[in-house]
């Protein structure tokens, strides 16, 4: 992950400086680029879609089923993840504590992804607005406020193009795992399991 982020940063910095040079503007230093709208927007736009995907995946797999998919819970029997938690010596402290702490902890995974999505969405919006206004200033055109930019098609295009690709990837895994196998992978059914069976 760190190597990919570093590669994104370096290539993004080079790309941005190339575009600035073509427009007759001064190049950005590494320190300037890390605070630029170009880097912030590109980074958090992708993180936003990943956290949205994981949040929805966690929530939807609670109740939705797909016959034959390795990603689905069983269609006809209760699984361990559906059972009510029982306090014991090695249980996480919210389970031992009970009450509101246990209620929150029962949904802490989806809540964490929701929080990460909201932070990433906000940072994507901030970076996209900053990049847009930087471009407008360089062209000596009017800038936008946050309340104006939230309705701008450019921002939503950036989000939706990533969201749809994440949903496509998840749907592909759920559907393809009905018929295809990968020996040794926990994402696959056993190689000899019939297509109609759900593990």
For every predicted segment, state its role.
Residues 22-33, 79-80, 139-148, 152, ...:
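Short, motif-level signal for alpha-helix interfacial/capping segments enriched in acidic residues
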Residues 10-26, 128-141:
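Interfacial/capping segments of alpha-helical transmembrane domains
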Residues 35-38, 88, 107, 124, ...:
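Histidine (H) residue identity feature
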Residues 62-85, 177-199:
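Cytoplasmic juxtamembrane regions at transmembrane-helix boundaries
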Residues 1-16, 23, 89, 116:
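Charged/polar interaction segments and conserved charged motifs
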Residues 1-2, 55, 99-117:
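Alpha-helical transmembrane segments and their helix-start/interface "positive-inside/aromatic belt" motifs
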Residues 88-102:
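Cytosolic juxtamembrane amphipathic/interface segments immediately preceding
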């Amino acid at each position: 992950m760190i190597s990919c982020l570093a590669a994104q940063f370096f290539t993004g910095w080079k790309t941005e400086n190339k575009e600035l040079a073509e427009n007759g503007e001064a190049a950005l230093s590494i320190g300037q680029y890390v605070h630029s709208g170009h880097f912030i927007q590109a980074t958090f736009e992708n993180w936003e879609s990943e956290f949205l995907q994981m949040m929805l995946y966690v929530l939807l797999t609670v109740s939705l089923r797909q016959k034959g998919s390795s990603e689905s819970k069983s269609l006809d029997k209760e699984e361990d993840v559906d059972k009510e938690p029982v306090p014991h010596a090695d249980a996480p402290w919210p389970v031992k504590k009970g009450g509101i702490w246990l209620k929150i902890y029962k949904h802490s995974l989806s809540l964490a992804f929701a929080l990460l999505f909201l932070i990433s969405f906000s940072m994507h919006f901030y970076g996209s607005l900053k990049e847009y206004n930087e471009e407008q200033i360089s062209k000596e055109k009017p800038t936008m406020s946050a309340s104006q930019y939230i309705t701008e098609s450019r921002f939503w295009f950036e989000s939706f193009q990533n969201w749809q690709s994440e949903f496509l990837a998840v749907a592909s895994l759920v559907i393809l795992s009905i018929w295809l196998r990968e020996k040794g992978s926990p994402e696959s059914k056993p190689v000899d399991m019939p297509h109609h069976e759900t593990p």
